[in-house]
């Protein structure tokens, strides 16, 4: 989609040129949100897949689709790595020599310590490296999946490394705020633990539950599809997320994810025991306590209490 020229109506321009490396859901949504707000001058982009580059060019996702990551970052004031965590090091190696002095390199990865370890060694001293993580997404992927509203009222966590320039950090915060996000800072290891609780372990549980249904010989595929209740449909939506991205997340956040899965297993055993022994009080008390988390999410504006059971509205 070609966006109109909004320069006469736009907010203060934060970066003259932004390069997006990787052109999937997050990068595409960033491009749409940048155009919506008019907060950048030019957007360049690169994706490893020639098919993705072709599609991105055809739909006008960015102003210029480049044939290499090195070409895309030349002259860019902000470079955002929107690739799976496992690909970060190789991309950083490629773009390092071509980065503009004074530029900022950031990312959108769901793991932060591994990204810092992979990327930081390849960033020149005259370039700012400021990791970030927008807590937004859908199960969709690819250059046509993005939309400008993805980050609206969602958190973007900025994870500065030691010695990060404060002015460059504030500039990146302003950029994400203008894309619609609420912005906060968090230390890398704490980020990885928090996300293991709120995102990584839940994804693994969803993959597992859908896998159990797929393996259960006594239940046919048609029954799983036709009689899926709201809870299972939520699992299938999560389990439809990009396999490469989530493989890399789990392999690069092992310690925190395994810690949370260990605690989950202990809780699950306790619930199994309560069911086996008929301990209804334990079950009721547990469900009452956990119910308050949902209400807290709604009150924080991160979801609504509107009924939505995945039915197509007529």
State where each predicted segment sits:
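NAD(P)+-binding Rossmann beta1-loop-alpha1 motif at the extreme N-terminus of oxidoreductases
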Residues: 11-75
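Internal alpha-helical scaffold of NAD(P)-dependent oxidoreductase catalytic cores
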Residues: 150-237
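Residues at the starts of beta-strands that form the adenosine-phosphate
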Residues: 17, 42, 128, 155, ...
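Rossmann-like NAD(P)(H) cofactor-binding subdomain of soluble oxidoreductases
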Residues: 91-144
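Rossmann-like NAD(P)-binding element
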Residues: 69-99, 103-106
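Short, Lys/Arg-enriched N-terminal segments with co-localized hydrophobic residues
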Residues: 2-10
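Interdomain hinge/lid region at the active-site interface
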Residues: 221-289
